[in-house]
Amino acid sequence: MKWLKSNVFVPVLAFVFVMFFWATAFAASDEIRIGVIGPMKFIQGKSQWNGAVMAAEEINAKGGVKVGSKMMKIKLIQADSNEFLSITDATNAMERLITRDKVHFVVGGFRTEAVFAMQDIACQNKVIFIGCGAASDELCNRVAKYYDQYKYFFRGTPFNSTALVKAAFSHVGSTAEVLRNELGITGPIKVAFVAEKAQWADAMVPAVQATLPKMGMELVGVWRPSPVATDVSAELSAIQRSGAQIIFTFFSSSVGIPFARQANELKIPAMQVGINVEAQKAEFWQATRGQGNYVITSSTYARNVECNELTKPFVEAYIKRFGEVPTYTTGTYESIKMSLVDTIEMIGTLDPDKIVATLENRVYKTPPSTIMYVKDNLGRHTHDLKFGPGYATGIASQWQDGEFVGVWPNKWKPAPGVEVTYKGVKPIKIPPWMIKAYKK
């Protein structure tokens, strides 16, 4: 009897294992595995995950992705890069996605220093990686210089640092015009430049030094706090003494919260304008204890502002799903749904080389913009985004009494005979303590 049980049990067990692995392999063959990599304990990574989840839910609800004659569902694999604190952790997270999880594609990445390493790993393994957070021009310059090696990388969001600078200067210029018109300031507007000490912001210092005087403004100083500083009172005291009327910010990390809060607590008579990624989130109001009022930041979305006909439906659906306005790192949504999936369905394959050859030549609409990938001045593909009217411009938004409202582009004139205003933008508001200090 023991012999019988043993001889029956072993084949049955073997059969079960075979069926399990066969079923697993079959299921995997019907899935498109997409890695979502980012700092998942922080707002930036959470937004990357939310955008990906929303895209996958919409795609799978319609039956999945049509790959030739086959329908395949999207499966997301989350990877916490911990890249704010460790580039090594970010590198390991990307390695695991590719070698252990066998992903077909990756979206995400945030801190430039970490994304360079992620880019190397993805491209070495011929895995298409759409960056949804890092702005460095060099990420796409690599594509142009070493195309065969780096062609698997595309920028999804934001547009590059050079374009971010152009947009930010436009926001500063619009704010300066409001100050001149409403406060009667006649001399050069005094500007303090404050950028977190990070690689992506380094090129901004010489750009600010060269550009502000041409805009009729005076640079009164440059400050470079840590991206994760919790106390910036020393910097703010110096800025207050400088007499700055605009504080031009470049923050992608958590320093944006204490800076905004402490500046308003001190009632510094100056407008905060520039990039403050933390200010793009609904939690910013609570995080600053209501002291984030009047902060202006470059952004991608604000409720009721429409860049095109796709913007409002996406924003409202996102708010319904997650209870907040999306930020730019939710660009994982369009990177999956419109960049990858639409291209896959066009050509009927997951072959990365064929996807690259098609995607790099596409022009297509997404909720925040129209995507076109530019070539460099030698005619080489860069897989970088075209910036300007009709393409990617972003918006600027301001916190006004607890509401995050779009304020730019509002009669923006990027070229002679061209004026751009997006539906839903509102006028910029000046803090009352600044009005009191300057208006006679």
Regions found by a protein language model. Give the residues of each.
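Extracytoplasmic ligand/sensor domains, especially the bilobed periplasmic-binding protein
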Residues: V103-V222, M271-T297, N304
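Segments of small-molecule ligand-sensing domains
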Residues: K320-T327, V341-P414
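Extracellular/periplasmic periplasmic-binding protein-like sensory domains
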Residues: S136, C140, P158-S161, A263-S335, ...
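Bacterial N-terminal signal peptides that target proteins for export
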Residues: M1-L13
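Extracytoplasmic "Venus flytrap"
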Residues: G35-M54, A79-I87, F110-R111, V194-A203, ...
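Short, polar/charged alpha-helical segment
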Residues: G45-V67, P206-K214
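Beta-alpha junction/loop-to-helix N-cap segments that form part of ligand/metal-binding clefts
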Residues: E31, I43-N50, V65-A144, G156, ...
